[in-house]
Amino acid sequence: MSVRKVLFYHENFPAGGAERVTMDIASYISNRGYKVYVLASNINEGDYSQLTVLKLPDRASVTEALGIQCVVDTIHSLNIDIFVLPVCSFIPLLEAVKQQTCSKLVFALHSVPFWEVLYSFYIKKAKARGDFFKTLEWWMLTYPKTMWLKKYDSPIRVRHIKIYELVDAYTVLCESYKKDLLEKIGMTKSGDKICVIPNSEKEVLQVNLDKKKQLLFVGRMSYDDKRVDRLIYIWHRIYRKVPDWELVLVGDGDERGRLEALVAKLHLERVVFAGYHTDVRRFYDDSLVLCLTSNYEGWPLALTEAQAHGVIPIAFDCTAGVREILAPTGVNGILIPPFSLKRYAKELVTLLQNPLKCQEIQKNVIMKAHSYSPDKIGKKWYALFERLCD
């Protein structure tokens, strides 16, 4: 039997969660006879032992004819069986691959369905910050048009219907996302192409359960989605009640300067800005609780990374992906109704003052992380690829 070949496209590789998942998939299927390639516009340093990384020519973008033709030519030259496009909904690229090659197409949605609407919604709110009239416009026009009238759903719906028609498989991260997507694109009674495959999380062989009294944030410091400022305000509410604890913020971004200024303005104690780190394992080893305060998340790998390291995750119940990872609350983590800082602070203090409860949840989250092992998730991708190739 000939070797089956899979090609992934990533703009930057490796870069974040989606790229890490691609490497986990490559590791699993390459051990079962597949040859895996990644085509990227920009290549960063990393371990590519399980796959071959190829670079698009300079100035070639997959949003333009030259880049699209490069992808098509790569598929032809390597005799690619399956082309996987994670995250980015580049319809002209999918159309070209569909029309000019025999490769099967997979679109992998690594976020919440219709994330584009949420992204635009919160970007507009971020731009209105500090401007009275723009803020008023956001509340009076943008908010009702987006949340009540769904005015901005229509073009996104058209795009995802087109993607669904073009591809052979469309992956989402949980069953709730599948149901939501089918409803949004008006296909409530079909949807055979949609496959539910969560993101993987590697097992930590030696979990350190002797944690410091340390709260942790890991991620990009951006206002429109991550809203780390909320965590600063939560810490402002509780830091005097938990005098032995500290807050460690790992990451960087456009918002960092404002966050540091906010900490100074509020005269907060025991807040550490640790900066960006490519390897965050030591922070998970040290910390007892991971805190996320995002507007929305698709399938936040920080939560599953925390669980794998025996770190208790707490987050707003903002999407089904977060709920899938942390539910039931108090067992696999802590879910907070969006976006109550008062409730978040209360639940956090209660947790920190109950060591026995912390120990119980730590054991639970380690077991929960095992359900997302690369072996279990890899089997799902392998089964999908085998079905497409038959």
Where do the PLM segments sit?
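Short hydrophobic beta-strand element within catalytic cores of glycosyltransferases
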Residues: 312-316
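Short His-centered aromatic/hydrophobic patch
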Residues: 85-91, 109-112
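Aromatic "clamp/platform" in nucleotide-sugar-dependent glycosyltransferases that forms part
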Residues: 276, 295
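Conserved acidic donor-binding segment of nucleotide-sugar-dependent glycosyltransferases
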Residues: 327-342, 350-356
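A short, well-ordered alpha-helix in the C-terminal region of glycosyltransferases
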Residues: 283, 343, 357-371, 379-383
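A conserved mid-protein helix/loop that constitutes part of the nucleotide-sugar donor-binding site
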Residues: 19-24, 222-237, 254-260, 342
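Membrane-proximal helix-turn-helix segments that form the acceptor-binding/catalytic region
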Residues: 129-170
